[in-house]
Amino acid sequence: MDIALDLQSIAVQEKTLVFPQFDAARAWALGSQLRELALARGHAVAIDVRTFGQPLFFALLDGATPDNVDWARRKGNVVAHFRRSSYAVGLRMQQAGATLADKHGLPVAEYASHGGAFPLAVAGAGVIGSVTVSGLPQRGDHELVVEALCAQLGHAYETLALARS
């Protein structure tokens, strides 16, 4: 995996995957899409879609654990703090040889800079929430979210997917 290449790709994903508007119905559709993708692939994951401060969709699939719920919360907190995907933040920390606690004073019990949380951005409004998956390796969590966002927004996933490692 090439960190610099992944960071470039994630920046394009974040710029492209923007909703014209977002509401509870759209959150439910996105969460349901993620659930169907995960079920079809046999993934044991937690799925969380929220605007900041308001949960709109949550699912815990068979085999997922309370640990996945906590990881999803902590990854979502990273999006809320940085307005970037948790994977991008984690890769930046890896590049810097630092942690969120070291560099930003953010407690590990509340923030996880691992892939899987992605900003929900609305044109003209900016980042208003996050969509998070937890239960796969971090790159897989991130890519599952991107795949569902592409489907919801009418983008070809193949054009926005991270390069295969």
Swiss-Prot record:
Matches recorded under SUPFAM superfamilies: GlcG-like
Signal peptide per UniProt: none
One Pfam family it belongs to: HbpS-like
Family: Belongs to the UPF0303 family.
Protein name, UniProt field: UPF0303 protein BTH_I2506
